[in-house]
Amino acid sequence: MGLMWGLFSVIIASVAQLSLGFAASHLPPMTHLWDFIAALLAFGLDARILLLGLLGYLLSVFCWYKTLHKLALSKAYALLSMSYVLVWIASMVLPGWEGTFSLKALLGVACIMSGLMLIFLPTTKQRY
């Protein structure tokens, strides 16, 4: 059950991260504070996506709280690395994100996935 909550948390956090990235690239920079505030108050699509991203992170924290009650800490924190993989893939697949493929990034993803498999593969107990 803890693994399920952890996966929910990772998926929701990944979507939230993509939402915040979209909002950050479309809203005025915070260095132009009044333009930024005006865009937020207009509550256009960019501001709504920003709000959804923030709410997504909040929901992700709830799922993470449930994860930590059910799953060993050493396994739970390893799950967080899945978010890097999901966001990398989504940035290349989703239109408008212009994520780039590189062998270096693929190697990093392979390392993350290998590490997760090592952590989550069942262990066999040896009898002596």
Curated annotation (Swiss-Prot):
InterPro entries: Flippase_ArnF, Small_drug/metabolite_transptr. Induction: Induced by BasR. One of its GO terms (biological process) is carbohydrate derivative transport. It is a multi-pass membrane protein. Residues 24-35, 98-100 are periplasmic. Its main location: membrane. Keywords: Cell inner membrane, Cell membrane, Lipid A biosynthesis, Lipid biosynthesis, Lipid metabolism, Lipopolysaccharide biosynthesis, Membrane, Transmembrane, Transmembrane helix, Transport. Residues 1-2, 57-76, 122-128 are cytoplasmic. Pathway: Bacterial outer membrane biogenesis; lipopolysaccharide biosynthesis. GO terms for cellular component: plasma membrane. The keyword Cell membrane applies. The keyword Zinc does not apply. Disruption phenotype: Cells lacking this gene are polymyxin sensitive. Lipid A is no longer modified with L-Ara4N even though the level of the lipid-linked donor of the L-Ara4N moiety, alpha-L-Ara4N-phosphoundecaprenol, is not reduced. However, the alpha-L-Ara4N-phosphoundecaprenol is less concentrated on the periplasmic surface of the inner membrane when compared to wild-type. GO terms for molecular function: carbohydrate derivative transmembrane transporter activity; transmembrane transporter activity. The chain crosses the membrane at residues 3-23, 36-56, 77-97, 101-121. It comes from the Bacteria. It is found in: Cell inner membrane. Translocates 4-amino-4-deoxy-L-arabinose-phosphoundecaprenol (alpha-L-Ara4N-phosphoundecaprenol) from the cytoplasmic to the periplasmic side of the inner membrane. PANTHER family: 4-AMINO-4-DEOXY-L-ARABINOSE-PHOSPHOUNDECAPRENOL FLIPPASE SUBUNIT ARNF-RELATED, SMR FAMILY PROTON-DEPENDENT DRUG EFFLUX TRANSPORTER SUGE. Heterodimer of ArnE and ArnF. Belongs to the ArnF family. This is Probable 4-amino-4-deoxy-L-arabinose-phosphoundecaprenol flippase subunit ArnF. The lineage of its organism: Bacteria, Pseudomonadati, Pseudomonadota, Gammaproteobacteria, Enterobacterales. The gene is arnF.
